[in-house]
């Protein structure tokens, strides 16, 4: 797999029926090794090992209901009272981060209303501090 702009780590890879799988420490199971999953596992490791977030406050593939449609946030970071604090959206390293990607994560944030949005393809990383504004009352 491609070298990323993230710290390297010792990952667990398995081969089954000609397909590669990588161990997801948050979901505690092997998942298909796709380019996007490669980015997810590296970024998750960065949050856990290098930034010190407890694994109990991170979750992968969190389902939300957006206007009657089921969607999945790639990774959600929670604070200690288990309120969502950050959404991370991953793309494969060869995917260019465009406005459409930010539109996607912003739609997810309409449901979770977090403080921080992160978008990464493993090469380029973007973090946004998000403030939820309300209209003034009379």
Can you annotate each of these PLM segments?
Residues 83-87, 91-130:
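Short, charged, amphipathic alpha-helix that recurs within catalytic cores of restriction-modification
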Residues 131-137:
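Conserved small/polar residues in nucleotide/adenosyl-binding loops
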Residues 50, 80, 111-112, 134:
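Alpha-helix C-cap/termination motif
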Residues 1-33:
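Interdomain/boundary linker segments immediately adjacent to catalytic/signaling cores
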Residues 2, 56-81:
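Active-site metal-binding core of divalent-cation-utilizing nuclease and nuclease-like domains
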Residues 29-30, 94-95, 133:
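Short, surface-exposed beta-strand-loop junctions and turns on beta-sheet-rich folds
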Residues 23-60:
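Acidic-basic catalytic patches of nuclease active cores, encompassing PD-(D/E)XK
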């Amino acid at each position: 797999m491609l070298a990323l702009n993230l710290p390297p780590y010792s990952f667990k890879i398995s081969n089954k029926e000609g397909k590669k799988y990588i161990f997801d420490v948050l979901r505690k199971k092997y998942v298909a090794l796709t380019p996007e999953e490669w980015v997810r596992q590296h970024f998750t490791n960065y949050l856990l090992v290098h930034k010190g977030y407890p694994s109990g406050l991170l979750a992968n593939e969190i389902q939300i209901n957006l206007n009657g449609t089921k969607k999945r946030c790639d990774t959600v970071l929670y604070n200690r009272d288990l309120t969502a604090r950050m959404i991370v959206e991953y793309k494969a390293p060869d995917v260019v981060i465009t406005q459409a990607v930010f539109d996607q994560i912003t739609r997810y944030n309409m449901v979770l209303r977090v403080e921080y949005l992160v978008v990464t393809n493993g090469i380029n990383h973007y973090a946004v501090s998000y403030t939820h504004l309300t209209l003034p009352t009379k």
